[in-house]
Amino acid sequence: MRAFQRYGLEHIVLCPGSRSAPLALAVGALIEESGINAYTAIDERSAAFMAIGISAASGKATIVITTSGTAVSNLLPAAVEADRSCLPIIFITADRPLRLKGCGSNQTVNQEDFLVPVCREVFNCPSIGLHEISGRSFFTLVKKTWEKAHAYPGPVHLNIPIEEPLHASFLEQKEVCNGWKPLNFEEIQLPISTVSTNTRIKTKEVPELDPSQPGIILAGPWRGKPSQLLGFRKAVKEFQSFTGWPLFADCLSAITIKQSGLISFWELLISAQIFESNDKLQVLRLGPLSCSRALESFLRNTNKKQVLITEGEERYLDPLHLAKQYSGGLQSWLKIFKSNYPNLNNNLVNDDTNILEDLLNKNQLVGDLVDKYLKEDSKITEPSIARKLLDLIPEDIPIMLSASSPVRDFLAYSGFSPFKRRLYSFRGASGIDGNLSLAIGLSIFLGPLVVVCGDLAFLHDSNALLLNQPKKYPLIILLIDNNGGGIFKQLSLAPIFKGSVDKLFSMPQSINIGDLAKAHNIPFRTISSFDELNSALEWSLKLSGPVIIRACTNSEEDTLLRKNITDGLKKYIN
C-alpha cells in the first residue's frame, strides 16, 4: 500500500473478508500513518462503481480490495464500465493458494480469469507469497500495475494468493508498521511511464478535412484524462475559429459556454429535419457518438469526409463505420492540420459563416418554442426537468445524469445551461447499474453534486445507500419516478400479442421510496411542481450526505410531449 501511495494512490475502497485480512490491516495502518482516504463497502459491486466515480473525477486510479470467491465476480459490471469509459481502477483481490485450486476447496474459484476480457492487464502474484520475492520484483509489480491502469486508462486486476495464518498477531502488526521488511529486501522506486505503448496509433495515417468546404464539428461525450481537457478545449476553439464551422456539442462534451459557434439545440434541429445533411458536408467528430438516433441517421446521409478524433482511445469508436479515426488527440491532429494549411486565417470560409449564422438564428427559434412548451408550465415533466433544473442550481455544482432517459432529455432540451458547468454520465457501456455508487464516488472528490436518475436506476443500485457517503456536503438525488422504465414508452414497439409493455419491459416496482430513505436515515421529500423543487433544492443544499427528492412524472404523457415539441418545431420553423 505504501508503494502504491508513492506512485500517487489517494483513495482506497475496502470490502470485508477474511482471506483479505492482511490487506485490510495494511489499509488500517496506512490510514493511521498517512491519512489516506479509505472507505468501506459491504457490496463489492457498489464499491467498484464508487471507486470508478472517484477515478473519473480525480484522473487517478482508486484501489478496490476484496476477499476471494464470488466477491471478485461482483467487480465485473464496474470493470466493464471502466474499460469502455477508459477510467483507471485497480482491483486487488485476495485468493486461495494454488494448491487449493481444482480440488473442491471452500470459496475457491478461478477468480483470476473473471476480469480478463475487460482488464488492461491481470497480474497473478507468485504463489510463494509477496514476502518471498525480491525488492526489485516487488516494486516492478507495483510499478507495472499502476502504469497499466494509467497509460491507456482502464481496469487492472492484481490477484494475490494468501496462505494462512491470515490474521497477524498484535506484535507482528506492530513490527510491520514500525518498518519491518523481509530479509534482503531492497526498497527502490522505479520511474512510471504513462505513455501508451499501443502500436496501432499510427500518426502517419492522419485523416484530412478541407477547410475551404462546408463542415460541422460534432463533440461527443468527453472521454479523456482530466489533464487533457484544457488543451482539448483550446484546440476546439482554434479549429472552429479557423473554419467557422458550427459546433454541435453534447451536454457531456465538457465544452464551455465561452466556445464560439455553439449550437445548443442541434439534436432537435436534426430530429425535426430543420437542418439536414448533404453530400458536401464534412464532419469533424470528437470522441464517442452521442446517444441520438436522429444523429445516426444524419451522419449516414453525409457522404463527404468524416474524421473521428479520440483522446488516446485506441479502439474504433464509429458504430456507423463512416469515419476515419485518429487516436492521437485533437491537439496533435490540429498541429498536422495547420501545417497542411499554413496560410489559413480565422473564418476564411464565407459559406460556413453563412451556415453558422443561419443555424444560430434557428437555434434561437428552437429555444423560444421549447420554452413555450416547457418553461411556461409549472408542471413537472422529464423534458421540463432537463430544461429548467440547471437554472435552479448554483453553477459551481456539477450534475451527473443516469443512463436511459435523463441523458437523452438533457441532450435535447437543456439548451446552453450544461455548458456553464460540468455534466457527467457514464456512457462506456451505458448501463443503469451502479449509478448511485458512481455519483457518490464523484461527490467524494468533487464536493456537492446533483444526480438525476430514474426510479429503476435508483432501485437497481439502492445498495449504494449503505455507503453512507459523502459525509460533509450534500449529494442530492433527484429521483424521476415514472413508474418503471419510461424509456420503453418512447420506443417504436409493435403491439404485443400476449402480455403488456409494463409487464415485459417497463417493470414498475411497488417500493415506497420514502420508507426506503427512512430505513437508511436519508432526508426525503416528494415534489409536484417547480416551486416545490426549487424549495427542496434550497433545503437540500444546507444538508450533509445523501438527500432524496422524488418527482413523479407520467411517461406516456412525456412521450407525447416530446413528439409534440418535434412536430411543433417542423411547423414553427419550416
UniProtKB/Swiss-Prot annotation:
Organism from which the protein derives: Prochlorococcus marinus (strain SARG / CCMP1375 / SS120)
Subunit structure: Homodimer.
GO annotation (BP), single: menaquinone biosynthetic process
SUPFAM superfamilies the UniProt entry points to: Thiamin diphosphate-binding fold (THDP-binding) (SSF52518)
Bridged cysteine pairs (disulfide): none
Gene3D superfamilies for this protein: 3.40.50.970, TPP-binding domain
Keyword tags: Magnesium, Manganese, Metal-binding, Thiamine pyrophosphate, Transferase
GO MF, one example: manganese ion binding
Identification of the protein by name: 2-succinyl-5-enolpyruvyl-6-hydroxy-3-cyclohexene-1-carboxylate synthase
